[in-house]
Amino acid sequence: ADPARLARGLEAMHRAGIKYVCYTGGEPLLYPHLISSLAQARRLGLETLLVTNGALLTPDLIQSLSAVGLQTLIISIDAATEEAHDRHRGVPGLTSHLQEILPLILQANIKALASVTLSRLIEDLDALVDFVRDLGFTGLTFSYPLTGLSSSYLGCADNHLVSFSPEELDQWFAQILDLKKRSSFVILNPRLAVKEARRQLRGLPGRFPCLAGFKYFFADWRLEVYRCHFLADTLGPLEEIDRITPVRDNCNACSIDCYRDPSVFQYSAVSLADTLSAWRQGKVIRGFKSLLNPQNFLSLRSLMEGRHWLQ
């Protein structure tokens, strides 16, 4: 991404009232202007997260990331054993490297979370939890497999490792819900969002519409803004995100966790905003209907469950 345009884009994000930015890839640690961009984001008051495979992390780089206020490192984990993870990543010794640098990350006051894409490399979720806990992670989030996307994002693969039938995916979601009941380890996916994903698989109507394009956006390396990385819809350049017309159309095209999970969290806040807007327009009954929607209480309970994202 052009660094000057990215800098202007961050300023536009600030003007738009956006509260956080997540740097992902590819591998964002390869971007030569990453540190200066993170520093600018923090100066503008944006919360910062970074997704990486961790291979390029060094003690000096961790200190640099800490110095510019990075709050969360999300590190990709592919399997429940050192051998399987390193082989799939194609980086011999990667697991040992992560085990060495994770204490340094935590000492630098950066939260360290494991991101695990559901795949056939994972045979036992309990073994997976033990693996990421032993490495030194403080929590994990499950990402759902993507076999195809319509945006420019390349984080998908039409591969048997991540190709599942609806029945197989439903079983995965059931296992995650069971794991959350049994495990003391922090699993960041909210129960309500996992249950919504199961409803979607079964063709049931969604209760919590996706807020991508309204509260969350995806910008690619060309700094073109998409409503999300599943759909092809583009909204304009990042430098103009403060002038983009948000999209709110109750989309149910995918179950991508990084949009659907926070959409559950923010449902009650959006309902409150709808209530206040209705009252300002003199639509009192409509406002109370929005305020007293029972889904608001489920959303608030889910937000308490997701407090680890907010700490």
For each feature predicted by the language model, list its residue ranges:
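Radical SAM enzyme [4Fe-4S]-AdoMet core and its adjacent flexible, acidic
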Residues: 1, 47, 66-72, 76-211, ...
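Conserved alpha-helical substructure of the radical SAM core
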Residues: 1-72, 311
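Residues that line or immediately flank small-molecule/substrate-binding pockets and catalytic motifs
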Residues: 25, 77, 144, 232, ...
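Flexible, active-site-proximal loop/turn residues at the rims of small-molecule/cofactor binding pockets
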Residues: 27, 56, 79, 146, ...
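Alpha-helix N-cap/loop-to-helix initiation residues
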Residues: 30-31, 58, 94, 121-122, ...
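Flexible mid-to-C-terminal extensions adjoining Fe-S/redox cofactors in radical SAM and related proteins
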Residues: 204-207, 222-311
